[in-house]
Amino acid sequence: MNIFVSCSSSDKISDEYKVVTRFLMESISKDNDLVFGCANRGLMGICYNEFLKNNRKITGVCYEMYKSDLEGLKLDEVHMVKYIKKYLMIMTLIHCVKCLIQH
């Protein structure tokens, strides 16, 4: 099952959020695949690394203006989008949205 994660990619975030995110992702990433916004920092980076550690399928959906964020990421699939409408459409139509984590 795909898990869509939408969360902060900022490194300037309370450690409390990092601990909770890691705890949740350690469990969720064992039996699910990740769909996320292509950042390897902040809470999004924690999510990415937990799924990577468990050898799960990782799909990124990235705005064209942030394509440099793809550097160094190990992704099984990437969808580049120009507008938020297409971003949301991909998330809802192509992938089974099961879990939403926001900060």
Residue ranges and their predicted role:
Residues 1-56:
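Glycine-rich beta-alpha loop segments
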